[in-house]
């Protein structure tokens, strides 16, 4: 398996042990006792954004690999929105993560180079990993239940950091407790959820 190095995991929610219960609706995210670590203004703001910031959780992992200091999740979101990487319309709908504004922002804010991969295959993702990149892949959030049939592709970002001929290794920011970190799935399974869109972040080029 081609793995660049150990990659720290970051969850979309402050308490990763609550994800199963939050996603299933048994627990309200506003009851997360650890939410203060994300520095949102109030529980409602935390609840609204936690389920929409998979890309920022992936970014935090990348910044940790590079040893780059990062602000709080709420401050990251403010910066991302200021650069157009997320957009909140007047009706409350969120667009994002929007790839090209995101790459412009992380280049300006953290000196982090990257590129968009469109219409890409898992072989292309593997080539990026071999060249020393980490890859944020667009998959269906249904990937947290890989043994069940899915009805969509895309809509959620996971951080791919390893692969071999048959399998893909990744972090899922909204995975259940047993499949959040260093998840290994057969390529054929991952491909069912994969939208063919990704962001490649060349770690070797960005090491300081």
Range-by-range predicted roles:
Residues 1-93, 148:
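Active-site-adjacent structural segments surrounding the nucleophilic cysteine of cysteine proteases
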Residues 63-64, 68-208:
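Conserved active-site-adjacent core of cysteine acyl-enzyme catalytic domains
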